[in-house]
Structure formats: structure tokens, C-alpha cells
From Swiss-Prot:
Residues 445-454, 478-490 have a biased composition (Basic and acidic residues). GO terms for biological process: maturation of 5.8S rRNA from tricistronic rRNA transcript (SSU-rRNA, 5.8S rRNA, LSU-rRNA); maturation of LSU-rRNA from tricistronic rRNA transcript (SSU-rRNA, 5.8S rRNA, LSU-rRNA); regulation of cell cycle. PANTHER family: PESCADILLO - RELATED, PESCADILLO HOMOLOG. Residues 323-416 form the BRCT domain. Residues 277-329, 517-582 form a coiled coil. This is Pescadillo homolog. Residues 294-309, 455-477 have a biased composition (Acidic residues). Residues 572-582 have a biased composition (Basic residues). Residues 294-317, 445-511, 554-582 are annotated as: Disordered.
């Protein structure tokens, strides 16, 4: 009655997957080319639910891909280009072996190439999709831009990554999109808001580093190849939204200001323009000169109370954001040669400040250290020989902390030689019941407009409290001794009959405290009964939630106790030092 009976492993999940070797043979590609193709197209291996069935009863470790993904790759134009390149390499090797140099030149001129434009359009149908997926591209391009020009990576890739990252930084500066900065062990984390999307990326520190041997640079280079194409599309579109010329050009006025006397000493002619752009100290040229327009304001429509509250909250948030964009506006900074120039210049320019540095350090310095209009000089050394009275000498952390606090923090904590406050991460948001460090509480008080208590006053208060405690202890011991004496005197006069005081029930009295207590007892009883009436699943979930809350409370108490012990130890050390001095 039925059709032919199918053999084992010819139906079901066994037919949905294909091994890597079979897929490679189907596409007629080498393993390296197959990996490149999968990275570029976004095809990843899958772990089958029933691995033994898919592996036809074998338990040997194998990599599986979905069969539909491999069929999708069969029609990819890049596969043909990979085959052409393989033939090109074979012909080139033959020409080298026969010493046919004219043939070598001809082959090099006709080297097969390919573009990834169609893959980018296929993987990211809309511009917002591309923006959401740009975090990894930014981090990878910034990493490659810091590489030394050795044989590990192609020089063209490093140069391209450097150009694209400089274009991105100039866009963020012009649009003032930067929101958060954090200095970590890995590097500097930045977060910008671009067209409503929060984009976070990591920039490594500008240190000389050796290339690790346990990293596959071919895989990284393949990812970078795709990311640079994507990055180019995004930069072009973003520059269009701001009416900027792409590729970016300096404003004619700014370019004349940056014209150095001995420009050829700093960089070659081919690199000088990129160096000027990477200085981030000048404005970019626009397609059409923009006329200053009034700031866009939200229209007010008569709405219900909830909608009105939401609108007011949005207006307040927009005002705070506009104020944050102008955080350093009107300030003039000078960077000493020992501070990280690029990161500080990038951050300060993002918030409207003017920045300069020593002209012998880098192209782009617009004014000298002797300029009397400088308001802040950023220094990372214990002391300065020559200081000007009309400016603040601060450590670099003040800039990063002020950006995260969305306000200009007091400069007294960041003077030369002072112990810096801890650098708090802006990416950590405490929930109810979480441990909040005292420095964060102090910062929140500053944001509310409250004046924090000085440390010296706190120390004096602590000393006064300790003295009061000593006096109280003495009084308490004296009272205790007096009571003992009275008890011994009254022992002979005690009566044999004892009167026990009666207990009044809380519901029999009409006091406010008893009513509150009665309500609390009723609520506790209702809660207990509700827990008793829960189903088994609900009870399990409730117990899990309560266990999590208790665990967080224990952790908070542990951290608070550690902090208190640390503060007590530091206070004891200070007292010992004072006692030694006296």
C-alpha cells in the first residue's frame, strides 16, 4: 500500500544537517576559503539535538552545518572568485618558476578581485540594522588601527582601519554624540548615541605590544575585511545626515590655522592630511554652508495627565542631554605631553571645549602653553616647575569622571599630587537593594545640588563621637554600680507578696501605635495564608525569588562590613600618624 521503505538515517533530522567536509567538497573550496566564505556570509555551525542520529550512529566529534545554508552558498558569486584566485596563484607560481617576468607582471595586473557590497546589503536590509551591529566592527577596526606595520597583517588593512576610525571620531565630535567613557584594564570603553541607537566600543591604549602567537590572524583579517566595507557605508551615510563632505575635508579656515611651518618633519605628504584629521582640533567642511537655526522644540498638545507627565519627563531628559553636550563649552584646555592626547582631545572636543598641545608633539596644536586664556591644563605628574595663576592644573581623570557625572566635578579632588577618587563605571546601574558605594552616593548628592561634607569635618565628628561614647560608657558604669548598691540595701526590706502587672491586649486600646501594629499583623497573616494557597509551581518560583533577594541582601551586608572595616583601618592609620607627629 505505502511507498518504498526508506533506509535508516535517510529521513528526519539526519537529512537536515551536513558535515563540514561534505559541505566543503560540495562547494569545491579549500578549508581556508570555506571558513572565509562562512564568515563573510554569516553562516555558523549548528549543534544538532540528536547528534548520534545526525552522525549516522557514530559518536566521533564532527562539525555540522544546516543543509539549507550550504545550498544558499552554492549561488554566491564570491565562490567563483575564490576559484579564479586559486587558478591565478597556480599560474603565478608557474611563471615565477620559469622566470617569465613579463608574464608575472601581466598576471599581477589582471589579479582577480571581489567586492562585498552585495553581502552587506543582504545582511543589513536597513541602515538601523547596520548601526545596531556596528559595536564589534568598531572595536575590531580600532584594534587593527593600533597594530604595527609588520608581516602579521597587510599594511593596506591597517591604513584603511585607521582612516575609517578617524572618520568615525570626527563624526562623533561634530554630532556631539558621546555619552559615557570608562577606563578599564582592556582599554577605554566609549558609548555614543547615534540616531537613537546606543553604540559601545573598546579602544586599546596606545602602547607598543607584541603580537601573540596563539591568535589566528587570518580569521581576524576576514572579519576586518567585512567590517571595513560595512564601516565605509555607515560613515558615508552618517556624514550625509550632518551635511558634511565625504571623504571628510577640513574647513578652509581651520586648515589654514593648522598649516605648520615645517609640516614635512611630522609626516609624509601622503599621511599629513590624515594626521590633521586625526588631531580632532579643527571643524570639518560642509557641503552647503549651514545657517544657524533655532533649536527644535517639542510641540505641546492638550493631553491626559499620564501623557502630560511622560511629555514633561521627555522634555526634562532632552534639556539634560543638551546641557551635557555643552559640558565643557567655553573652556580652553592644554594637554601636557605625558597624557593620552588622542582620547582626551576626542572627549573634550565632543563636549565643546577648545584643545591644544605642544606643536612638537603632534600636528594640530592651535595655541601655545603661554596663552593666558587657557582655563585648564591637564597634567599627569606630581608637580610642575612653572605654574600660571589663572588656570587649573588637574589630572586626566577629572575629564572622564565629569563626563560620566554629566557635570563639572570640583577640581579640588583632582589637583596635582592628590590621591584620586575611585573611577566608577557608568555602565553599572544599581537596583533596589543593591550595594551602592559611598563615592556613588556622594556623586548622586552632588548631582542633586547638595554640598558634600568635607573629610576633615567628618574626622572631627568621628573624634567627637568617640569622646562622647567614652563619656557615656563612664556614666553607664557609674549608674550600674549605684543600682547594685541600692539593690543590696533593699534586700532586707523586700515583701513576700509580689504583684505581677497585667498585659493589655492591643485591640483593647485605641492608641495609634497599636492600630498600626494590628494592621501589620493582619497583613502578615494574609501573606502567610496566600503563600499556603499557592500552587506547587508558584510556590517554587516564589521561593526562588525570595532566595535571590536574601542572597543579594547577604552580599550587600558583606560588602558594607568590608567597607566599614577598611575605613576603620584607614582611620586608625591616620590617628597613628598624627600621634607620631605630635
Amino acid at each position: 500500500m505505502g511507498g518504498l521503505q526508506k533506509k535508516k538515517y535517510e529521513r528526519g533530522s539526519a537529512t537536515n544537517y551536513i558535515t563540514r567536509n561534505k559541505a566543503r567538497k560540495k562547494l569545491q573550496l579549500s578549508l581556508a576559503d570555506f571558513r572565509r566564505l562562512c564568515i563573510l556570509k554569516g553562516i555558523y555551525p549548528h549543534e544538532p539535538k540528536h547528534k548520534k542520529k545526525v552522525n549516522k550512529g557514530s559518536t566521533a566529534p564532527r562539525t555540522f552545518y544546516l543543509l539549507k545554508d550550504i545550498r544558499f552558498l552554492l549561488h554566491e558569486p564570491i565562490v567563483r572568485k575564490f576559484r579564479e584566485y586559486k587558478v591565478f596563484v597556480r599560474k603565478l607560481r608557474k611563471a615565477y618558476g620559469k622566470a617569465e617576468w613579463t608574464g608575472v607582471e601581466r598576471l599581477r595586473d589582471n589579479k582577480p578581485g571581489y567586492k562585498l557590497d552585495h553581502i552587506i546589503k543582504e545582511r543589513y536590509p536597513t541602515f538601523i540594522d547596520a548601526l545596531r551591529d556596528i559595536d564589534d566592527a568598531l572595536s575590531m577596526c580600532f584594534l587593527f588601527s593600533t597594530f604595527a606595520r609588520t608581516g602579521k597583517c597587510h599594511v593596506q588593512t591597517i591604513t584603511l582601519c585607521r582612516r575609517l576610525t578617524v572618520e568615525w571620531m570626527n563624526y562623533v565630535v561634530t554630532s556631539r554624540s558621546l555619552r559615557k567613557v570608562f577606563l578599564s584594564i582592556k582599554g577605554i570603553y566609549y558609548q555614543a548615541e547615534v540616531l537613537g541607537q546606543l553604540i559601545t566600543w573598546l579602544v586599546p591604549y596606545q602602547f607598543a605590544h607584541d603580537h601573540p602567537t596563539d591568535v589566528d590572524y587570518r580569521v581576524m583579517a576576514t572579519f576586518t575585511e567585512m567590517y571595513t566595507t560595512l564601516f565605509g557605508f555607515i560613515n558615508f551615510r552618517l556624514y550625509q545626515t550632518l551635511n558634511l563632505v565625504y571623504p571628510p575635508k577640513l574647513d578652509s579656515k581651520a586648515e589654514s590655522e593648522l598649516k605648520a611651518e615645517h609640516e614635512e618633519d611630522y609626516a609624509m605628504d601622503s599621511e599629513s592630511y590624515l594626521e590633521k584629521l586625526s588631531a580632532l582640533s579643527a571643524s570639518l567642511a560642509r557641503v552647503v554652508a549651514t545657517v544657524e537655526e533655532e533649536e527644535n522644540q517639542l510641540d505641546n498638545f492638550p493631553t491626559e495627565e499620564e501623557d502630560q507627565e511622560n511629555m514633561q519627563a521627555r522634555e526634562k531628559e532632552q534639556k539634560e542631554q543638551e546641557a551635557q553636550k555643552r559640558l565643557f563649552e567655553g573652556l580652553k584646555f592644554f594637554l601636557n605631553r605625558e597624557v593620552p592626547r588622542e582620547s582626551l582631545a576626542f572627549i573634550l572636543r565632543c563636549f565643546g571645549a577648545e584643545v591644544s598641545w605642544d606643536k612638537s608633539l603632534c600636528i594640530g596644536g592651535t595655541y601655545e602653553v603661554t596663552d593666558e586664556t587657557i582655563t585648564h591644563q591637564i597634567v599627569d605628574r606630581p608637580d610642575m616647575d612653572k605654574q600660571y595663576i589663572n588656570r587649573y592644573y588637574i589630572q586626566p581623570q577629572w575629564v572622564f569622571d565629569s563626563v560620566n557625572a554629566k557635570m563639572r566635578l570640583p577640581v579640588e579632588d583632582y589637583f596635582l599630587g592628590t590621591m584620586l577618587p575611585p573611577h566608577l563605571s557608568p555602565f553599572v546601574e544599581e537596583k533596589d537593594g543593591d550595594y551602592v558605594p559611598p563615592e556613588k552616593l556622594k556623586l548622586m548628592a552632588l548631582q542633586r545640588g547638595e554640598k558634600p561634607v568635607q573629610e576633615e569635618d567628618e574626622e572631627e565628628e568621628d573624634e567627637d563621637e568617640e569622646e562622647d561614647d567614652d563619656v557615656d560608657d563612664e556614666e553607664f558604669t557609674e549608674e550600674k554600680n549605684l543600682k547594685k548598691m541600692e539593690d543590696t540595701r533593699a534586700q532586707g526590706k523586700t515583701l513576700s507578696v509580689k504583684v505581677t502587672p497585667g498585659k493589655v491586649k492591643p485591640w483593647e486600646t485605641g492608641s495609634v501605635g497599636n492600630k498600626v501594629r494590628l494592621e501589620q499583623e493582619e497583613k502578615a497573616e494574609e501573606k502567610r495564608l496566600a503563600i499556603m494557597m499557592m500552587k506547587k509551581k508558584e510556590k517554587y518560583l516564589y521561593d526562588k525569588i525570595m532566595f535571590g533577594k536574601k542572597r543579594t541582601t547577604r552580599e550587600v551586608n558583606k560588602l558594607t562590613a568590608k567597607r566599614k572595616a577598611h575605613e576603620d583601618a584607614s582611620k586608625a592609620q591616620k590617628k597613628q600618624k598624627k600621634a607620631k607627629k605630635q
